[in-house]
């Protein structure tokens, strides 16, 4: 008997603002417990339950093949494809076996590896082709652009490397396989493995977040309009090539997490699960409630057992078959609220507990986190939530929803707003420190300057906002340009302060580390179906005559500095927030991090009060290696001196420069 224990929520102890909602939190916790009990009948674990991918769909057996599908609204189902010359034949009709399930068993010789097939679904008012809901391999015809399921039964992939340990502080490289090539084309899993993984390893990232893996009909959706939740995208290669990519990353000590889409489904009916069995309510909400008015997609009904089973099985499938180390859940805000949080300012705790909250979605997310930890206790889960839902990144056994981290989405907004609305001499150091560290004490976050969202067409990356047109003709090391100098300097400082003040982890989108120019624009009718802006120009980072190369080296050394000196192992302590001088300094462990954001002023013998000791510079943004001006003497050591009952460092701080100093010797020089 696997009955979930009844526990009391501990959230109120962590957040006193939740005291008026103590009973609501307890009900939420109890709801998840009872839902798990209902799903498992108290006879098994969530992991035992989440095996839909092993039951439904097409599977090889000792006797031949078995195919099963859930379609309670259907009156007849047929398999058809290469094996039937694409004709609907009675010998390939499925049999109803109860509870809305259908089944057919076929001799081994009927199907061969690589054959294409579909479902013909018949319901009371119509009939149409469908792809199986649990299909694990889908391909698209080059000419007709029609999608079909594919029989996929290759030799089993042999895993070579053990799973890496969970990073305490994920330094995440957000990547899209398809647009990772230098060439104007769709890249592949194999090319990514051969050319991009070594770059990521050299830069020092310990986690890769792979986007657009779940199959999606429209390449330009960036992978966020999913049709086939169990099928890795055919565009990039075979499932085994994806396995090899992940296996190779594991051999480098890098974790790989999936950007999983459980917030909605593409509305396409032939390719996806919209109106799958002729109804619009098998996995999604009925009617308007099931339509996302902004995304134009289908919204899951998390109160349905079929939906919970489908989505939980999906998580187990990706973890067990492909060895993903965790998930970044996209669109969590959209899941948690019936209005999807659209245009809403979350200003009151009442908004987290009113009738707009989809409690079924909260329950699903809680069960999802329980499941993945049953499968692997050191799994990594991240929530993309802009609402600030309490308990999002808090253990389920203590009343939380269970994620390890939530995305700190306000930081990216802060940087955009700052660059758009304030001149450099209007930056506020106290506000900057607060914005970088603003979070609930009980939750950890993933900080980032910009992710893929800021790079899309219609928006601008931060460096493009700062340098604009000069990125095309003034990034040469042989060209002097004040706008470029400012942009290069601030690009380094903004990324360093975001990373060194993060509370849990850090994320960067592929190419932004070196200030990739321009925007992302996937092939579409409006751009002549061009891949010109759906690629990454790695040659810019590799060309030492361009300042992109210095930004790339700075990103590498910044990450290695943070890891080697264990900066993130202790909380930041503010040492200086001088608004007039635009100087910000703080301590993390044995390191002191100092920023001079002033656009013009450099300071000699600037006082920073800190712990007594002898310090050495371990990172200097002004180093010529990073296309700085070399005004800081990194060979010096800095010894604190007593001053007015404290200990102080006297530092030379050039304008728009940051330095990281590490204590190399403890001293007791204190007044």
Language-model segments: residues:
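Conserved, mostly hydrophobic/aromatic
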Residues: 69, 119, 175, 200, ...
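C-terminal beta-strand-rich structural cap/linker in extracellular carbohydrate-active enzymes
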Residues: 113-117, 634-671
